[in-house]
Amino acid sequence: MANCIVRDWQGKEAGKASLDLKVAKEASALDLMHRAVLRQQAHSRQGTASTLTRSEVRGGGRKPYKQKGTGRARQGSVRTPLRPGGGIIFGPKPRSYNLAMNRKERRSALRTALMARIEDLVVVKDFATTLTTPKTKEIIDALGRLDVSATSKVLIILTNPSEAVRRSIRNLETVKLIAADQLNVFDLLHANKLVVGEDALAKIQEVYGDD
């Protein structure tokens, strides 16, 4: 179990919260998180790269010149991979890059990654609830009050962020917003700081704390 200090929108201490998630064994934790990140990155690939082989490129199979008497290497087709406009040897073809990983392993990797970043986690009560119109400066100032730089890689985790909050955050290149029930290992490990709403922390405990 990890205890966290809860801060309000002004950056002042407003209580305490706890997070109790079951993590993987130390001997296998690093490998588990590594496989989860590899799987996530592999699944983001479209796998649509495609090249034409000598049987698919445009043009006939005409023999460019006679077999003997030219002094040149023999050629059997104008579409051989050795000639301009010919086919590609061992080029990419559409394929799936998906990697298999058990559901229990995926959830364990996510819980382990989250608990590993507990020192970089900032819990905020009522994050931007007073924000009615998009104001990026308000988000920057609030992060500053929480001792979090808006120019560093920040992951903000909320339950149901309003449209004003979404539009305020999307102007910040290094700040990413994600829902509490849609966490992923890559974002948790990639960010320098995790800013979590108090209700989002409770949602995380509810969704991922049942194993």
Curated annotation (Swiss-Prot):
The keyword Ribonucleoprotein applies. One of its GO terms (molecular function) is rRNA binding. Residues 41-54 have a biased composition (Polar residues). Pfam families: Ribosomal_L4 (PF00573). Keywords: Ribonucleoprotein, Ribosomal protein, RNA-binding, rRNA-binding. GO terms for biological process: translation. Residues 60-71 have a biased composition (Basic residues). InterPro entries: Ribosomal_uL4, Ribosomal_uL4-like, Ribosomal_uL4_dom_sf. Residues 40-85 are annotated as: Disordered. One of the primary rRNA binding proteins, this protein initially binds near the 5'-end of the 23S rRNA. It is important during the early stages of 50S assembly. It makes multiple contacts with different domains of the 23S rRNA in the assembled 50S subunit and ribosome. Forms part of the polypeptide exit tunnel. Part of the 50S ribosomal subunit. Belongs to the universal ribosomal protein uL4 family. This is Large ribosomal subunit protein uL4. It comes from Synechococcus sp. (strain CC9311). The gene is rplD.
